Amino acid sequence: MASDPNEVDVLEKCFEGVLGLMETRFTSHQFFLRLAHGHQREYVAGLAAFADGGNPFRDLHHALVKRLKKLEGEAITLRKESYPSQDIFGTPSHSGLWKKL
């Protein structure tokens, strides 16, 4: 997909509020869970926008990480690119480790 669908723009507008609820340090997976919990309709719409690719969770989450990286140095900083974490399904995985500024 050349550019992210509009649904990612809608979710990005929720970032400031979600970041306010996060601990000082958090993983991308923790951020996704908080975003999904607080903005369920928008999150489901985001998943649906990526459904044709066959991996909607992975593809949406990659798009969301790209948007989070736009905030680096302003609101957050990426401490580790690959940090041990459980994904949103509870499966051992890796994700970014962030710190609020």
Identify the role of each PLM range:
Residues M1-L21, H29, R34-H37, R41-L101:
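Phospho-regulated, low-complexity intrinsically disordered regions of nuclear gene-regulatory
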